């Protein structure tokens, strides 16, 4: 199934980490794009994929954007395993693209809202190499009975951090379903932090986004800048400007390479 192009928000600073966030049922990636600026992580690139449109059972069979079919939203509801596996493969491909571009798996965090959270969780748990983290906002664990046999050994051995946020007044994905999912992951050995939000419905909140920001800062902190060569005179103008930018040093008053070089040498 052809997937729409994701919304990509480039890092505003030196790119050293990537966050992939999946939307919920009936939504699209652009709806969550403002989260990128709200997180205030200049070193992070954010990718907001959009699901293809398909018939959805819980939507009376009407087509809408969905990562897989949803037959129900209770702990006993059957899952669309084939649809979920296709979505996981897509997320793994997005991760592979980031790795090919030079971002290690340990610097990639996946997460999402509602059904997007469910898919991103499985994507992190089954990825061959340990990711930097995973977050679920109002989500749940799909295929609970089969996940133990699908788990990547590195997910447990590297203690990949998982943040699971859920509102107590969620009437779409019931709070109890979130609790059951979190407990199931914990029993599997997952390094999970379950956070309840009193009074919150099937939505996000400023406090939840603040908690997500703190989680991302902990999982994928800004990488320290590369060391400055002892003799930077052989560097190009672009490289000298890059060194200054990484360290927050203004170079707008540098009109010659010698000016840049003098500023860089002052940092040694």
Label each region the model flagged.
Residues 225-268:
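Basic helix-extension-helix modules of the SAP/HeH family
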Residues 31, 90, 119, 177-180, ...:
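Acidic, Ser/Thr-rich intrinsically disordered and amphipathic helical segments
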Residues 22-24, 112, 138, 166-167:
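The conserved beta1-alpha1 loop
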Residues 16, 23-26, 78-85, 203-206, ...:
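Intrinsic disorder
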């Amino acid at each position: 199934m052809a997937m729409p192009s994701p919304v990509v928000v480039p890092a505003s600073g030196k790119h050293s980490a990537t966050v992939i966030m999946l939307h919920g049922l009936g939504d699209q990636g652009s709806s969550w794009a403002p989260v990128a600026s709200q997180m205030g992580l200049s070193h992070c690139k954010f990718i907001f994929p959009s699901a293809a449109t398909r018939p959805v059972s819980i939507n009376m069979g009407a087509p809408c954007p969905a990562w897989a079919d949803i037959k129900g939203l209770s702990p006993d509801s059957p899952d669309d395993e084939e649809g979920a596996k296709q979505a996981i493969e897509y997320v793994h491909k997005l991760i592979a693209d980031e790795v090919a571009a030079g971002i290690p798996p340990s610097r990639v965090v996946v997460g999402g809202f509602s059904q997007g959270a469910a898919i991103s969780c499985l994507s992190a748990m089954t990825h061959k190499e340990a990711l930097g983290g995973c977050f679920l906002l109002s989500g749940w664990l799909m295929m609970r009975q089969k996940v133990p046999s699908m788990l990547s050994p590195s997910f447990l051995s590297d203690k990949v951090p998982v943040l699971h946020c859920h509102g107590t007044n969620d009437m779409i994905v019931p709070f109890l379903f979130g609790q059951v999912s979190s407990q199931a992951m914990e029993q599997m050995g997952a390094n999970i932090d379950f956070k309840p939000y009193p009074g919150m419905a099937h939505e996000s909140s400023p406090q939840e986004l603040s908690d997500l920001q703190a989680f991302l800062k902990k999982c994928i902190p800004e990488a320290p800048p590369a060391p400055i060569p002892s003799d930077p005179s052989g560097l190009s103008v672009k490289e000298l400007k890059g060194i200054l930018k990484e360290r927050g040093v203004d170079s707008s008053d540098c009109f010659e390479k010698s000016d840049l070089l003098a500023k860089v040498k002052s940092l040694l």
